[in-house]
């Protein structure tokens, strides 16, 4: 699973747990409604300011949205994200 897919999955889970539609989350986070869908569909990753807005709007922590993402150390060109072991 890619970083985008894992983050999108985490965002969708937190949004559903908060009982919000994508549009409601977008309004609360002051971001465009299509941005939420694009993030959930793994078409883009949020900037750090958007991450902060999303956590505030969801009442979630950044840890929840980043859950399952791990960095595998290495040369800056060779390091990569990997799926966390279950």
What do the predicted segments below correspond to?
Residues 1-6, 76-77:
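A detector for short, charged/polar N-terminal pre-domain segments
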Residues 30-45:
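Recognition helix of helix-turn-helix/homeodomain-like DNA-binding domains
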Residues 11, 25-26, 36-39, 65:
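Conserved hydrophobic/aromatic packing and binding residues within compact polymer-binding modules
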Residues 9-28, 53, 79-86:
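Short basic helix-loop element that most often maps to the first helix and adjoining turn
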Residues 49-64:
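DNA major-groove recognition helix of helix-turn-helix/homeodomain DNA-binding modules
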Residues 66-86:
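Short, charged recognition helix plus adjacent turn
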